[in-house]
Swiss-Prot record:
Name of the molecule in the record: 2-C-methyl-D-erythritol 2,4-cyclodiphosphate synthase
One Pfam family from the record: YgbB
EC class name: lyase
Binding positions for a divalent metal cation per the UniProt entry: 10, 12, 46
Family matches, as PROSITE patterns: ISPF (PS01350)
Organism: Verminephrobacter eiseniae (strain EF01-2)
Molecular functions (GO terms): 2-C-methyl-D-erythritol 2,4-cyclodiphosphate synthase activity; metal ion binding
InterPro entries: MECDP_synthase, MECDP_synthase_CS, MECDP_synthase_sf
GO biological process: isopentenyl diphosphate biosynthetic process, methylerythritol 4-phosphate pathway; terpenoid biosynthetic process
Length: 183
């Protein structure tokens, strides 16, 4: 069994005049703030996207969906996450599970976690039981604690699709070289 783990992290500044979307769910910030970014700035989905791409050794969100590309301006991060999942599957892996944490002083997120889990599971094409979202505050510390930013972290577990031999192109070359069959 070939298991791989990826880690993702993202942070976006809170500013007036922007929507606040976390985990594919639009929320209201008590101070009327939203997240600044090229896309919809969904900090949680960006962290999960990075974790998945990293687990499959496919780089990061900036490589696949650069903020210099107008095609991704105001993009729905659920679509970016779905495309990242498609690329992970194309590389020969299936998604095992996602564990994630959002760190925000406000708004309170606990009541929104079921909707976030559902939105993430739908974007990934997995069962909701494969997705976990936790919410924490920064206890008033740092930029997150001062309502200047929201941060998210994620871990993704992926496993090779049976029969796909998903060890990645570089590892396949090394394996071939070791077995004497050349690169």
């Amino acid at each position: 069994m070939n298991l791989r783990i990826g880690e993702g992290w993202d942070v976006h500044a809170l500013v007036p005049g922007r929507r606040l979307v976390i985990g594919g769910v639009e929320l209201e910030h008590p101070m009327g703030l939203g997240l600044l970014g090229h896309s919809d700035a969904d900090v949680l989905l960006h962290a999960i996207t990075d974790a998945l791409l990293g687990a499959a050794a496919l780089g990061d969100i900036g490589r696949h969906f650069p903020d210099t590309d107008a095609a991704f301006r105001a993009a729905d991060s659920r679509l970016l996450l779905a495309e990242a999942a498609r690329r992970v599957r194309a590389a020969g892996y299936e998604i095992g599970n996602i564990d994630s944490t959002v760190v925000a002083q406000a708004p309170r997120l606990a009541a929104h976690i079921p909707a976030m889990r559902l939105a993430i599971a739908r974007a990934l094409g997995v069962d909701q039981g494969q997705v976990n979202v936790k919410a924490k505050t920064a206890e008033g510390l740092g930029p997150v604690g001062q309502n200047l930013a929201i941060e998210a972290r994620a871990v993704a577990l992926i496993c090779a699709t049976p029969g796909a031999g998903a060890i990645g192109p570089a590892a396949q070359r090394v394996s071939s070289a070791w077995s004497g069959s050349g690169a």
